[in-house]
């Protein structure tokens, strides 16, 4: 999980301009990290590229926290 989390953290920091310390597993993209719906779409696209996978729109809607992303990605690798 550590490597996956660190890769996700880097993407979130770069995309949302938040401090790395704010990107915790329980952090909500919208409530804690200030992402709007466009930010979330762009994050999903970057995650797909980084981890070489496809996240369906239906699955993307279920992803609310950093931990959700880690769980989703690790479940598909």
UniProtKB/Swiss-Prot annotation:
Domain Carrier as annotated: residue spans: 2-77
User: Could you confirm whether the keyword tRNA processing appears in this record?
Assistant: no
Q: Where in the cell is it found?
A: Cytoplasm
Please describe what this protein does.
Carrier of the growing fatty acid chain in fatty acid biosynthesis.
Question: Pathway of this protein?
Answer: Lipid metabolism; fatty acid biosynthesis
UniProt PTM comment: 4'-phosphopantetheine is transferred from CoA to a specific serine of apo-ACP by AcpS. This modification is essential for activity because fatty acids are bound in thioester linkage to the sulfhydryl of the prosthetic group.
Query: What is this protein's record name?
Result: Acyl carrier protein
């Amino acid at each position: 999980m550590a490597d996956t989390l660190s890769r996700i953290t880097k993407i979130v920091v770069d995309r949302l301009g938040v401090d790395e310390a704010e990107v915790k597993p329980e952090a909500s993209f919208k409530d804690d990290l200030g992402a709007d719906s466009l930010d979330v779409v762009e994050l999903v696209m970057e995650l797909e590229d980084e981890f070489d996978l496809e996240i369906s729109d239906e699955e993307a809607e279920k992803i609310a926290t950093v931990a959700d992303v880690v769980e989703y990605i690790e479940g598909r690798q």
